[in-house]
Amino acid sequence: QESVKNKLLEWLGGDLQDWNISRDKPYFGFKIPQHDDKYFYVWVDAPIGYIAATKHYCDENKIDYLNLWGKDSNYEIHHFIGKDIIYFHGLFWPAMLNASKYTLPSSIHAHGFLSLNGEKMSKSKDTLISADKFAEVYEPDLLRFYFASKLNAKIDDIDLDLKDFVKKINSSLVGKLFNIAKF
């Protein structure tokens, strides 16, 4: 995405500061060995989970995870992230991968935030639909279709308007399938 690339180039062209990878107690996450009151900052350990999850899958399926993550991998790695973590996934994560001799992401796909009927999703305000509850009512592929119809190369937020969702599914899928079935 051009806007992500431009923002990363702006940061790289500026005065990058040292990155403090520790947080003081009280904090959650992984403790730093030999430092009782210090924890690794979440954006240090969280992306490492991508490799750990891949390795777990590969171990269970007798695949060498380095075929995917190794420096000489022929596979592409695509990161789908929210716009608020571009800084970490576009600067620090590639630096960590490079220093560890892992392959770098082929592409970073950043998207905006998701709102529900025009409101920010929030547990406390009860403006939230969990994926499992949604799947009890609608097929997940319908939601994927709806989101895909809303996405573009920009980093715009997406509003899940349930009335618009039903209208879009009915007009784009049900109506067209009905017309095809008439032939």
Give short role names for the model-derived ranges.
Residues Q1-F183:
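Structured secondary-structure scaffolds
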